[in-house]
Design a protein with these regions (language model features):
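Polytopic transmembrane helical bundles with strong interfacial aromatic enrichment
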Residues: 1-130
């Protein structure tokens, strides 16, 4: 679980850095829609970073399949949030990042899958953990 704790902390740190970057450097460079999309990526990255941290620290409440859910959540977060970041700043770059467009819904689908998989793998035999 320590690997996922490190991943979660990295997700949170990067989301704070990108939040500051967006608030101070990108606010005058991006359209309102692009900035809103950028913030969506940050929000999802932070929420899932915190979720991975909480789940990793409470791994005893889940079946041994928790690692699969955490891996899916990590992959989904990278695909979803980072594709949004690059698509949001596409007009600022000298090359197009529009090819990343399909990764956003794929990442979102993986995130949804990770939560459903997690739900299905909560220990049912111990009600003190629910």
């Amino acid at each position: 679980m320590s690997k996922f704790i490190k991943v979660s902390i990295l997700f949170c740190v990067v989301s704070v850095i990108l939040g500051a970057f967006g608030a101070h450097l990108l606010k005058d460079l991006l359209s309102e829609t692009e900035l809103s999309s950028f913030k969506t990526g940050i929000r999802y990255q932070m929420f899932h970073g915190l979720a991975i941290l909480i789940l990793s620290l409470n791994s005893n409440k889940f079946t041994s399949k928790l690692k699969t859910s955490l891996l899916l959540m990590s992959i989904g977060t990278v695909l979803f949030s980072f594709s949004i970041y690059f698509l949001s700043i596409d007009d600022l770059l000298s090359f197009s990042m529009k090819f990343l467009g399909p990764l956003t819904p794929i990442g979102g689908t993986i995130l949804i899958t990770s939560w459903i998989y997690l739900l299905l793998n909560v220990k049912n035999n111990d009600t003190t953990h629910i």
